[in-house]
Amino acid sequence: MKTKIFPLNKIAFACSLLLANPLAWAGDQFDASLWGDGSVLGVDFARFNVKNAVLPGRYEAQIYVKFEEKGVSDIIFADNPATGRTELCFTPKLQEMLDLMDEAIVKSPNSEDDTCVFASDAIPKGTFEYQSGEMKLKLELPQALTIRRPRGYIAPSRWQTGTNAAFANYDINYYRSGNPEVKSESLYVGLRSGVNFGNWALRHSGSFSRFENQSSSGFTDKGKNHYERGDTYLQRDFALLRGNVTVGDFFSTARIGENFGMRGLRIASDDRMLAPSQRGFAPVVRGVANTNAKVSIKQNGYTIYQITVPAGPFVINDLYASGYSGDLTVEIQESDGKVRSFIVPFSNLAPLMRVGHLRYQLAGGRYRIDSRTFDERVLQGVLQYGLTNHLTLNSSLLYTRHYRAGLFGFGLNTPIGAFSADATWSHAEFPLKHVSKNGYSLHGSYSINFNESGTNITLAAYRYSSRDFYTLSDTIGLNRTFRQFSGAYLPEIYRPKNQFQVSLSQSLGNWGNLYLSGQTYNYWEKRGTNTQYQVAYSNSFHILNYSVNLSQSIDKETGKRDNSIYLSLSLPLGDNHSADSSYSRSGNDINQRLGVNGSFGERHQWSYGINASRNNQGYRSYDGNLSHNNSIGSYRASYSRDSLKNRSISLGASGAVVAHKHGITLSQPVGESFAIIHAKDAAGAKVESGANVSLDYFGNAVMPYTSPYEINYIGINPSDAEANVEFEATERQIIPRANSISLVDFRTGKNTMVLFNLTLPNGEPVPMASTAQDSEGAFVGDVVQGGVLFANKLTQPKGELIVKWGERESEQCRFQYQVDLDNAQIQSHDIQCKTAK
């Protein structure tokens, strides 16, 4: 192989050819005679005489069925000998994404066979349109042949398990304070770690702490190093269960009934595995259209859904759960222009579920509290079911050797608001006292929005518990104490008797916002009633924001009454800086504070705060803080001092360490599921959707949060990478499972410009307009005049390239190459391309 450096001006013509649009529109004819006769003999230019012509090869495209996006996938085009055109191959992956009825597919592809099944043969009633400029593939098909799925539905077969990896989240805080008399320091390290292998995820949480106090007299109190375990469990999801299985130490997660720590086994549903339009509560809308009609659904004056339905009964069951309450207005516009409407009551503030939907949890094991596991074996079952548009049933059972409890309740959706009620019965046994207690607890709540007036009563709840009602934690705690003191000691516990709370918010338009809340409660073992009230008002005057908060608490047992007032002002200073001031009074204590805070930096990665305060006793204090966020974590520091000679300093850091197949990467704290991003040689490139996340020296970064069972788009901004690094694509799509660690590989090249001067064994140049692919079928470049292959998409420094100007073996050749991808200069190689014998 002969190698030389090629001057830039000699490839200008070749570049212009490659940058030109190779597609021809219907009616345009490609005149092959313009290209002479020698180097282009044997090339079929007819492929360019059709609309949206495309060269054979593998492409990445956004897939649509009608107007519904199905996701991103690789698609393959190949020459169809029957039509003489380049056509789309119907692959198993494409079949899975389209989610069509069996009757729509005449010929299915074989996953074990690489033979191209052309889409025109597989789906004769469908029309495919590939828009190369926008990288979109659209399928038009009769509606009767498409499967009606809820909006946002993703087939479980497309959920991605992720990669094997390990991580450790850390949160470190060091605090030191002192005055001339006493000095103290403490260290806290919070930990949440995990290992993923296959479909299973191992998780652990815990914390380490230590402290030390020292007096001026020389006395030192050194606390013991202490590690407190949280939970440690193994978990995986199962599509068949529409939920997950957890084994180990965990906390129950029931939405109704009692929650507690347990060592054992849990099977629970996960609503995130439903399509987004099936999560939360939204009513099913049923109606009848007399003709082909347009159905519009409005809430609070806004259209939230619109669809065209044929004549006859229709059902709409894929409304997205709304964060707002408000009845739904359904309008049916017939083809003759007549409009009918009706109302469907809707409130999302009660524990409601969609019709036919089930939420469950079944857990069994040993009771845990404060990192300790007890012999008390516990069995818990929770079930919620959407019976109708208006009624949801709730139930829960709890069983141990010395405790039983059962709950039954309902949520009710009505035109005058949302109601919920439940009753819990309990049976508690205290063996050492030779006594058992049977009790009950009643609970009810009501909520409503008045959208016209802007009034929102978010919660009006009441609970009454009988004298002999005990919770599981009450029962186990008392029995532990009885055993410890041989039944001779009766600990003092406070068990609720009556509880009532209400909150109301009112929008006053230009006059601001008003918030009112109140609660009252008492205990069986304690005289008197505790009552708390709060009134808050907020508004703005030009750019000045202000708020007022009044509160009162009353303890009738002691006769103590606390009144407090809090005033705050905030003034923007421009460019993410602001000044704020506050005044508070509680009893005879008065405090005033003045501060400045803000953020700065290209991506506002730095933030600060400076404050000064004083009270009516002459006490003064000053403090400042500074924090920084970047790809590998967040760091913070603060300092304070006061007029009593107290001083303190605090240092903190939080982040994560992730170990994976490409190495070890430092990261911001990661969530339940996250993504590892790898792009070789692209250090410095920014992750589009990640706050202050960039690729490190090794081309790795971590996207700290992803949404499970949903399409997540991971984008890269290559502007800060080296200029000669080229991305095959700057956006990838993932659909992670819960607790998964996704590995997102971006294929890159050094954008090395390589010219291969190709000749055939007979000495003739390779035909112009031939295409070159690597051993994996990826497009590498086109052959221009004189048999010159302009290859700027090489990803490997050596390998084999295949050049095609037709589908027959006699119309293709291949050659071995070796280049320097780190060389920014244009390289040229004289190579003989070998044909099949």
Curated annotation (Swiss-Prot):
GO CC terms in record: cell outer membrane
Annotated membrane topology: Multi-pass membrane protein
Cellular location(s): Cell outer membrane
Keyword field: Cell outer membrane, Disulfide bond, Fimbrium biogenesis, Membrane, Signal, Transmembrane, Transmembrane beta strand, Transport
GO molecular function, one term: fimbrial usher porin activity
Signal sequence, renumbered to the chain: 1-26
GO biological process, one term: pilus assembly
Entry keyword annotation includes Cytoplasm: no
Disulfide feature: 813-833
UniProt cross-references to Pfam families, sorted A to Z: PapC_C, PapC_N, Usher
Annotated InterPro entries: Fimb_usher, Fimbrial_membr_usher_CS, FimD_plug_dom, PapC-like_C, PapC-like_C_sf, PapC_N, PapC_N_sf
SUPFAM superfamilies membership: FimD N-terminal domain-like (SSF141729)
Function: Essential for piliation.
Similarity annotation: Belongs to the fimbrial export usher family.
Protein name, UniProt field: Outer membrane usher protein HifC
Lineage, highest ranks first: Bacteria, Pseudomonadati, Pseudomonadota, Gammaproteobacteria, Pasteurellales
Gene that produces this protein: hifC
